[in-house]
């Protein structure tokens, strides 16, 4: 659900003073996997700080009203036989992807809870605030061969904020999205409708509208290396029967994929799709991904559960596989790179980190539109209520 960013191609803006402060020793960051193959870095077990919901009109609510509950078909019953094409396009209300939400929903949550954060407001001054999806892209970067990305970064009251910008290539691809791909996107949401109920112990109702404006989001705290993190991500459902009832350990991620019939197909699945599933679920501490495998007619014929902590075992002995240590080490390196690059505390100043497959991460500096993303209502309220804080948390925070 993490929002995409601006739509216009960047025009480099003259910002003399900030440009002079860019560190000259580290102008770019390389991304080759071999550079990040060291031991797995420290990653603090994610803890949930709170949640919020977005309704059918994409309006924010600081509660769990949009949370759904995992309700799979009986284990000993017949196969699932879910028709993922049912209701398309008549009962489909997709989110308007032209609307640039940036970090706005997460920032509203931060405003409402800034005085209740564990460790006090001083903790936030040393943290990085972003969406889980942005971190997922960083984790998979060393192995990504097709899609580049851009991340806008601003420092305000000590906190580093990261917000994705839609690249021109991604925008062109989205606007030219073929009908089959649009239908496949619908199928993923339809699968959730077959697997989730509105209350614990309830039954799914796949007859209703699929509205992708609706979302339940968890807000989490963690730390990667010496980088405190506050991030949010959409949660598909909560499992009332989970051994641990404390979020995020009771959350379940739902996915769909085409049926596999050969070892080669499974090998490709493990190398590519499972990497993204792992990154997306490992970051927030979601323990299981439940996948529905669909046939060419769009029916789910089988379900399979992938424990997040066991996904790497499928590629451990594959020379062309991925390594979690590489993913996390690169993410930590990027955070260090960003923290040392974005040194000026100014919500109107943006460092744009850009990456294309095969190249390094590069940086350009911009002021105000079109890249500035911290809204005035957030900046003004934080400035009035909390004076700029210089305290940086210790690595053990």
Curated annotation (Swiss-Prot):
| Chain positions recorded as Mg(2+) 2 binding sites | 192, 234, 236
Provide the positions where the record notes the PTM Phosphoserine: 394
Question: Where in the sequence does UniProt note compositional bias of the Basic residues kind?
Answer: 1-10
Q: Where adenosine 3',5'-bisphosphate is bound, by residue?
A: 185, 236, 280
- Which positions are annotated as binding substrate? 58, 101, 131-133, 217, 234, 255, 280
Q: What is its EC number?
A: 3.6.1.-, 3.1.13.-
GO CC terms in record: nucleus
Main localization category:
nucleus
Q: Where is this region: Disordered?
A: 1-30
User: What family name appears in the similarity comment?
Assistant: Belongs to the DXO/Dom3Z family.
Protein name per UniProt: Decapping and exoribonuclease protein
> What is the species listed in this Swiss-Prot or TrEMBL entry?
Mus musculus
């Amino acid at each position: 659900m993490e929002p995409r960013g601006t739509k216009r191609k960047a025009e480099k803006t003259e910002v003399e003073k900030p440009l002079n402060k860019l560190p000259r020793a580290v102008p770019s960051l390389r991304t080759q996997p071999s550079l990040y193959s060291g031991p797995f870095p420290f990653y603090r077990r994610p803890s949930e700080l709170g949640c919020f919901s977005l309704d059918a009109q994409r309006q924010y609510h600081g509660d769990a009203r949009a949370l759904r509950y995992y309700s799979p078909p009986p284990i000993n019953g017949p196969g699932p036989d879910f028709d993922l094409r049912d209701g398309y396009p008549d009962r489909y209300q997709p989110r308007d992807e032209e609307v640039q939400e940036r970090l706005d929903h997460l920032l509203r949550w931060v405003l409402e809870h800034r005085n209740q954060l564990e460790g006090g407001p001083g903790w936030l001054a040393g943290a990085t605030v972003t969406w889980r999806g942005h971190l997922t892209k960083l984790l998979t970067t060393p192995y990504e061969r097709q899609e580049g990305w851009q991340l806008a970064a601003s420092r305000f009251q000590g906190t580093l904020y990261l917000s994705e910008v839609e690249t021109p290539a991604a925008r062109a691809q989205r606007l030219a999205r073929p009908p089959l791909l649009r239908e496949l996107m619908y199928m993923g949401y339809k699968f959730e409708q077959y697997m989730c109920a509105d209350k614990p112990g309830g039954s799914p109702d796949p007859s209703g509208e699929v509205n992708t404006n609706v979302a339940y989001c968890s807000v989490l705290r963690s730390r990667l290396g010496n980088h405190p993190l506050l991030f949010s991500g959409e949660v598909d459902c909560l499992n009332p029967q989970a051994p641990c009832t404390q979020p995020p350990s009771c959350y379940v991620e739902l996915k769909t994929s085409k049926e596999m019939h050969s070892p080669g197909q499974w090998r490709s699945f493990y190398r590519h799709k499972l990497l993204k599933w792992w990154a997306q679920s490992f970051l927030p501490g979601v323990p299981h991904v439940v996948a529905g495998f669909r046939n060419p007619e769009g029916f789910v014929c089988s379900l399979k559960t992938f424990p997040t902590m066991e996904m790497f075992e499928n590629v451990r002995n594959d020379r062309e596989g991925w390594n979690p240590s590489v993913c996390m080490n690169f993410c930590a390196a990027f955070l260090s790179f960003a923290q040392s690059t974005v040194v000026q505390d100014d919500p109107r100043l943006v460092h744009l980190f850009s990456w294309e497959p095969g190249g390094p991460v590069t940086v350009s500096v911009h002021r105000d539109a079109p890249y500035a993303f911290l809204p005035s209502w957030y900046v003004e309220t934080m400035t009035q209520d909390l004076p700029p804080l210089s305290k940086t948390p210790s690595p053990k925070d």
